UniProtKB/Swiss-Prot annotation:
Keywords: Apoptosis, Cytoplasm. Coiled coil: none annotated. The keyword Cytoplasm applies. Interacts directly with BCL2L11/BIM, BAK1, BID, BMF and BBC3. Interacts directly with PMAIP1. Interacts with BOP. Interacts with ING4. Interacts with UBQLN4. One of its GO terms (molecular function) is channel activity. Belongs to the Bcl-2 family. Retards apoptosis induced by IL-3 deprivation. May function in the response of hemopoietic cells to external signals and in maintaining endothelial survival during infection. Can inhibit apoptosis induced by serum starvation in the mammary epithelial cell line HC11. It is found in: Cytoplasm. Its main location: cytoplasm. InterPro entries: Bcl-2-like_sf, Bcl-2_BH1-3, Bcl-2_fam, Bcl2-like, Bcl2_BH1_motif_CS, Bcl2_BH2_motif_CS, Bcl2A1. This is Bcl-2-related protein A1.
Length: 175
């Protein structure tokens, strides 16, 4: 399986949600790509949740369908200019984590089926809308990992935080 195929991306999306929700998987260790993604996206997600708390508090994620609707609206705005880059792709994962936490905050118990549904539509979006760009830019292992693994944490953090703040500020027009 190549790193631009749906199954690979879906695995990254599922691994990220397990990381965000602190779900331990006995006997399985995330790939290097998954670990780098978790580090970068969770840093961005944490900062966004802290700095944009008031904005995020204004929207309710009460179902997977609501999460999908919000996700599609935000991604449509995020990519309407046709520009794809690694920072924007990281924001997709950070937003996946935010939506999932909002949804599970409304539920009595964690429902892994809901998480699987969210990781599915996130992976579907990434594969369909950024897959070709990812392939042209070295793929996950030779593009993404090389870009984010060797950079200073602050430079990466500032680059990606700017993108996700821009995206989430767009939520204000919907909620």
């Amino acid at each position: 399986m190549t790193d631009t195929e749906f199954g690979y991306v879906h695995g990254l999306a599922e691994d990220y949600l397990k990381y965000v929700l602190q779900i331990q998987q006995p006997g399985s260790k995330p790939s290097k790509t998954s670990r780098v993604l978790q580090d970068v996206a969770s840093s961005v997600q944490d900062e966004v949740e802290r700095t944009l708390k008031q904005c995020l508090d204004k929207f309710d994620v009460v179902s997977v369908d609501t999460a999908r609707t919000i996700f599609n609206q935000v991604m449509e705005k995020e990519f309407e200019d046709g520009i794809v880059n690694w920072g924007r792709i990281v924001t997709i994962f950070a937003f996946e984590g935010i939506l999932t936490k909002k949804l599970l905050g409304k539920c009595i118990a964690s429902d892994m089926d809901m998480c699987k549904d969210i990781s599915f539509f996130v992976a579907e979006f990434i594969t369909e809308n950024t897959g070709e760009w990812i392939k042209q830019n070295g793929g996950w292992e030779n593009g993404f990992v090389k870009k984010f693994e060797t950079k200073s944490g602050w430079l990466t953090f500032l680059e990606v935080t700017g993108k996700i703040c821009e995206t989430l500020c767009r939520l204000k027009q919907y909620y």
